[in-house]
């Protein structure tokens, strides 16, 4: 059971960050997957947060090294758009926020990209595809 304020690594490079007072959850590897996959990351809320406030939140993330994203050519005149795709399943259909950050850009800056995605049908695996436009600023360090 996970609760409190922290960030924990769960499964295969996936990190879960959260700020909760009374809420608790478990993270497990599941065999409930979209076609073609062996396992998925499953988050079960075991105790709902009793009082949400402006600092309450949760996020699932994956840290990707700069050497793995050089093909984006971010911050150059040859910058290319890139695509983030993932499968998602939830017991609640609706619109959810998505963001990612690129840390440690040239000059020490950080780039954040914010958008939303929609889960159309509850309890159904759906593939989501997010395309990010070309970015001519902030070269990604090669590390």
Task: Briefly describe each language-model feature range.
Residues 1-143:
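Extracellular and organelle-lumenal recognition/adhesion modules and their flexible linkers in secreted
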């Amino acid at each position: 059971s996970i609760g409190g304020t922290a960030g924990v690594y769960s499964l295969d490079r996936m990190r879960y960050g959260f700020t909760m007072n009374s809420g608790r959850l478990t993270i497990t590897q599941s065999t409930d997957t979209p076609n073609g996959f062996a396992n998925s990351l499953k988050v079960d809320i075991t105790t709902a947060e009793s009082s949400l406030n402006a600092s309450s939140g949760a996020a699932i993330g994956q840290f990707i090294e700069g050497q793995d994203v050089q093909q984006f050519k971010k911050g150059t005149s040859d910058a290319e758009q890139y695509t983030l795709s993932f499968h998602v399943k939830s017991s609640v259909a609706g619109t959810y926020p998505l963001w990612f950050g690129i840390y440690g850009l040239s000059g020490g800056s950080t780039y954040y990209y914010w958008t939303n995605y929609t889960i159309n049908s509850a309890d159904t695996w759906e593939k989501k595809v997010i395309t990010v436009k070309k970015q001519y600023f902030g070269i990604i360090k090669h590390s």
